[in-house]
């Protein structure tokens, strides 16, 4: 597990929500540390795998208003900002965080800055500022001939994250 993720798991405290947990690797590590966590994912197969591994897990969309539990730590690792989708959704994302965080709670998430994809040979960065934010991408999963639907995914650079966090009452 990458060092950054190990640090996040060590810092996670209280009741922990592991968002977009996938196979549950972070929740498994939290369990081994004796920490109280709940893993959520929208994929029924991911939830099935987690349950088979002994991870407390539920099939839940993070944005589902019916999911009303409170957590001391919200964990969003492995490019956790992706579920924001695009910058148009960022206010909704922070509102949702406010609704699931217990008083004094924290969010531990990571993201990749895709700026390196726009680096020129001389080291300069060539980004079209008139275009949409460079970290917004469209994904489509494929297995053999089976194509999934496309979906939005957001990679945030730290400065953009810090700006929107402050605009929404958080600190990065």
Where are these predicted regions, by residue range?
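A short SAM/SAH-binding and catalytic strip from SAM-dependent methyltransferases
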Residues: 71-91
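Conserved SAM/SAH-binding loop
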Residues: 23
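Conserved alpha-helix/loop element of class I SAM-dependent methyltransferases that forms part
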Residues: 1-15
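SAM-dependent methyltransferase
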Residues: 103-160
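Conserved SAM-binding strand-loop segment of SAM-dependent methyltransferases
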Residues: 54-64
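A short glycine-rich, Lys/Arg-flanked "PGG" loop and its adjoining helix->strand segment in the class I
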Residues: 91-103
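Conserved SAM/SAH-binding beta-strand->alpha-helix loop
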Residues: 43-44
